[in-house]
A protein has these predicted regions:
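Transmembrane beta-strands of outer-membrane beta-barrel pores
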Residues: 36-42, 54, 74-80, 100, ...
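Short loop/turn motifs that connect adjacent beta-strands in outer-membrane beta-barrel proteins
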Residues: 21-29, 57-68, 103-112, 151-154, ...
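Outer-membrane beta-barrel "beta-signal"
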Residues: 48-52, 175-188
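Transmembrane beta-strands of outer-membrane beta-barrel proteins
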Residues: 28-34, 66-74, 112-118, 155-159, ...
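Cleavable N-terminal export/targeting peptides
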Residues: 1-27, 188
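Transmembrane beta-barrel outer-membrane domains
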Residues: 27, 41-49, 65, 85-93, ...
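Extracellular loop and loop/strand-boundary signature of outer-membrane beta-barrel proteins
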Residues: 36-38, 82-86, 127-133, 166-171
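Transmembrane beta-barrel domains of outer membrane proteins
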Residues: 53-57, 97-103, 146-148, 184-186
Length: 188
């Protein structure tokens, strides 16, 4: 089975979910993102992720050109390993994220940012490649840096370093570290 046919259920999920969530008066999807990445272990795992974001209606320390805000990130990912056994899995995650960001309107529509997030991941399998993650529930923590650009920072390009592990709920805890690059689009 090719990567495209494995990712198809992920695409269908988001295409079905997106129109009603974006089109309503009480819209709960503010932006979407597409992410690709690799692990930095000897696992040779590729990651393909689609995400939906909902910004919090609150900011802090917003007296100057920089502010702290946050958002919820819901994503569905497909992990593909070179290993014939335990070669793939799906990952559904929910992560609250804090972001330090420059106001795009004060910086000619260019908005650098950094962010941190810790959330829960539900994996379809407990093993990927040679790694035994022990549980289907995992914690994901990440640090990210990026740049918003375009009209009001509508587009985003971001790098994330993400650590996924079971938090020593069960042994073994063979965590995995990921290098991810994302492109995002904000609806407003």
């Amino acid at each position: 089975m090719t990567v495209i046919t494995r990712i198809l259920p992920v695409l269908v999920y988001f295409l079905v979910l997106l129109p009603p969530a974006y089109g309503s008066e009480t819209r709960w999807i503010d932006s979407v993102s597409a992410t690709v990445g690799k692990d930095n272990n000897s696992n040779n795992t590729d990651i393909y992720r689609l995400g939906l974001q909902n910004k919090w209606n609150r900011t802090w320390f917003n007296g100057g050109a920089w502010f702290v805000g946050g958002y919820w990130d819901v994503s569905l990912a497909y992990w593909d390993s070179d290993n014939d056994n335990n070669g793939s899995l799906y990952d559904l995650s929910l992560t609250p994220i804090l972001r330090l960001q420059r106001d795009a309107e004060l910086s000619h529509s260019v908005s650098p940012f950094s962010e941190v997030g810790v959330g829960g991941h539900l994996l379809s399998e407990r093993e990927i490649g040679e790694r035994d993650l022990s549980t289907n529930f995992q914690f994901g923590s990440h640090l990210g840096v990026g740049l918003g650009f375009g009209d009001k920072g509508r587009y985003e390009l971001m790098y994330r370093y993400q650590h996924v592990s079971n938090g020593n709920i069960k042994s073994p805890n063979q965590a995995i570290n990921l290098h991810l690059v994302s492109f995002g689009y904000a609806f407003e």
